[in-house]
């Protein structure tokens, strides 16, 4: 009985891990991938442990297999997280990088704030949180490109 429980827990953990959004956390790396693959960048400013709309956006859009299937060959996903809890503190270098991204792309400090960039980092448009489906949110991101 214990063995079956442990096996089911491992499988459950793997299923959550397999469906996680693949995030890049460095703008230069995102630009390089975007340029190589002829893709645009979706830059997401979020407060992963304090911003309720950010958490909803992650749960309802980014973490869904539906959105991931639609976006994986179309966008490079770049995350700039600003957690507040001590246990979620980012490494200093990453925090400095995120602060620079915020100065450049989110000077008003909106959370969540989704910015679509071209492969060289030019802003094409932006979105915030809205209650919608992963497919409709994806279509809004694509519409920004056009």
Give, region by region, the residue ranges found by the protein language model.
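Typically the conserved alpha-helix immediately C-terminal to a functionally engaged Cys/Sec
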Residues: 54-70
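Non-catalytic, surface beta->alpha helical segment in thiol-disulfide oxidoreductase systems
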Residues: 104, 108-146
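Bacterial Sec-dependent N-terminal signal peptides
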Residues: 1-22
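Solvent-exposed loop/turn segments at secondary-structure junctions
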Residues: 48-51, 61, 82-86, 109, ...
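A short beta-strand-turn-helix
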Residues: 24-41, 71
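Hydrophobic beta-strand anchors of alpha/beta hydrolase catalytic cores
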Residues: 42-43, 77, 114
């Amino acid at each position: 009985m214990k063995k079956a429980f442990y096996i089911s827990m491992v499988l459950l953990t793997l299923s959550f891990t397999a469906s996680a959004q693949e995030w890049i956390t460095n703008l230069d790396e995102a630009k390089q991938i975007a340029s190589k693959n002829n893709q645009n960048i979706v830059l997401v400013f979020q407060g992963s442990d304090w911003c309720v709309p950010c958490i909803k956006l992650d749960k309802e859009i980014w973490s869904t297999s539906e959105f991931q299937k639609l976006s994986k060959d179309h966008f490079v996903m770049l995350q700039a997280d600003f957690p507040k809890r001590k246990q979620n503190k980012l490494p200093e270098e990453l925090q400095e990088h995120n602060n620079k991204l915020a100065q450049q792309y989110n000077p008003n400090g909106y959370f969540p704030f989704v910015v679509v960039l071209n492969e060289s980092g030019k802003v094409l448009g932006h979105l915030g949180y809205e209650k919608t489906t992963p497919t409709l949110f994806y279509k809004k991101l694509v519409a920004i490109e056009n």
